């Protein structure tokens, strides 16, 4: 048998889907192929890696995927990947196919899975795929800017009816435990104030803030992060609405939910993805392994796992103060 000369990479998407994941597959495949690297896709994330669900990239038609949301290769929750024997089988599946490098597109849990695989000798690269923007090694994550656009579009629609009927609108956005979607969404839509995990408001504080806004105008639009109301002793949004309605502040609740994952990636999103994908393939060409790729000021950057995991989150208190200046 002749010795293997062509490098092989496997790519998987993991965690919650994010707009731009498909575009990342497209760009990685394009740049890898032009560098004479053979590409495989792993279906259904780490679940598929364990179950050996690898297919050559040329078997999937990506021609309509650049502008589509979701992930055409799937993503499944797979808590069993925490078990060493499961990861060992996943690593063995890569080894038997002579895969040289694994590229993981996902959030912080996906990154940890890659780090654990790297400890078993798998050469890994991670790209930040999550709408939550909670990967500290990247200024913006893949999907965040597009989710932000979906918030802008939906809040714009909510604003018109809220103003027409002189109401209070509470718009809940995603973000898990990161407030960036709420903060940047509030900035993009000129919302009256914002509530995030770093500036939580109880019912009394929320009511006081709304009343301050209503002193100057007949409507109020509030953007709140998910996982605040209805948790840790805070009233549910339904209870808040009932309280406001009973106190002559008619309230509409709008939870944007998974619509934030469903928009086609924006132009800037695609530009950043293209640059990060090219950077990833360049790192593979240099055999600089076990790297976390991100972007800073629209320039691709890379760090090793320990560097990336030890980066602190960005302090958004100044931005929150700007948004909430009328309720302070």
Curated annotation (Swiss-Prot):
Job of this protein: Catalyzes the phosphorylation of D-fructose 6-phosphate to fructose 1,6-bisphosphate by ATP, the first committing step of glycolysis.
Positions of the catalytic residues: 132
Coiled-coil zones: none
Residues the record lists as binding substrate: 130-132, 167, 174-176, 226, 258-261
EC number: 2.7.1.11
InterPro entries tied to this protein: ATP_PFK, ATP_PFK_prok-type, Phosphofructokinase_dom, PKF_sf
Key words, A-Z: ATP-binding, Cytoplasm, Glycolysis, Kinase, Magnesium, Metal-binding, Nucleotide-binding, Transferase
Stored Pfam families: PFK
Gene Ontology terms: biological process: canonical glycolysis; fructose 1,6-bisphosphate metabolic process; fructose 6-phosphate metabolic process
GO MF entry, a single one: 6-phosphofructokinase activity
S-S bonds: none
Family recorded in the similarity comment: Belongs to the phosphofructokinase type A (PFKA) family.
Gene name of the encoded protein: pfkA
The species this protein was found in: Mycoplasma pneumoniae (strain ATCC 29342 / M129 / Subtype 1) (Mycoplasmoides pneumoniae)
Entry binding sites for Mg(2+): 108
NCBIfam families named among the record's database cross-references: PRK03202.1
Protein's name according to its UniProt entry: Probable ATP-dependent 6-phosphofructokinase
Predominant localisation class: cytoplasm
Keyword Transport listed: no
Reported cofactor(s): Mg(2+)
Pathway assigned in UniProt: Carbohydrate degradation; glycolysis; D-glyceraldehyde 3-phosphate and glycerone phosphate from D-glucose: step 3/4
């Amino acid at each position: 048998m002749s010795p293997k000369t062509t490098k092989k990479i496997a790519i998987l998407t993991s965690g919650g889907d994010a707009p731009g994941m498909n575009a990342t597959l497209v760009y990685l495949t394009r740049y890898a192929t032009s560098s004479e690297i053979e590409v495989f896709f792993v279906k259904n994330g780490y679940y598929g890696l364990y179950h050996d669900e690898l297919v050559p990239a040329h078997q999937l038609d990506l021609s309509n995927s650049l502008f589509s949301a979701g992930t055409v290769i799937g993503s499944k929750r797979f808590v069993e990947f925490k078990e060493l024997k499961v990861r060992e089988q996943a690593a063995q599946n890569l080894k038997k196919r002579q895969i040289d490098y694994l590229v993981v597109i996902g959030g912080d849990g996906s990154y940890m899975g890659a780090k654990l695989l790297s400890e078993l000798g798998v050469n890994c690269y991670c790209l930040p795929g999550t709408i939550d923007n909670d990967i500290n090694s990247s200024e913006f994550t893949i999907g965040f800017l597009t989710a932000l656009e979906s918030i802008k579009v939906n809040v714009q629609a909510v604003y018109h009816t809220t103003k027409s009927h002189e109401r209070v609108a509470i718009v809940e956005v995603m973000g898990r435990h990161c407030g960036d979607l709420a903060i940047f969404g509030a900035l993009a839509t000129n919302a009256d104030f914002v509530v995030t995990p770093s500036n939580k408001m109880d019912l009394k504080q929320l009511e006081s803030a709304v009343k301050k806004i209503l002193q100057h105008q007949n409507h109020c639009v509030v953007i709140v992060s998910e996982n605040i109301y209805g948790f840790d002793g805070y009233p549910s949004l339904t209870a808040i609405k009932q309280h406001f309605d009973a106190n002559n502040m008619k309230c509409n609740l709008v939870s944007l939910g998974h619509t934030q994952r469903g928009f086609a990636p924006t132009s800037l999103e695609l530009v950043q993805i293209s640059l990060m994908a090219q950077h990833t393939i360049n790192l593979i060409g240099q055999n600089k392994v076990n790297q976390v790729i991100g972007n800073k000021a629209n320039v691709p950057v890379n760090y090793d796992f320990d560097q990336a995991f030890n980066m602190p989150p960005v302090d958004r208190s100044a931005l929150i103060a700007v948004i909430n200046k009328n309720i302070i």
